Amino acid sequence: HTAADLLR
């Protein structure tokens, strides 16, 4: 997953 995905 991506960095943005970790924040979701």
UniProtKB/Swiss-Prot annotation:
It is found in: Secreted, Cell wall. Keywords: Cell wall, Secreted. GO terms for cellular component: extracellular region. It comes from the Eukaryota. This is Putative mandelonitrile lyase. It comes from Taxus baccata.
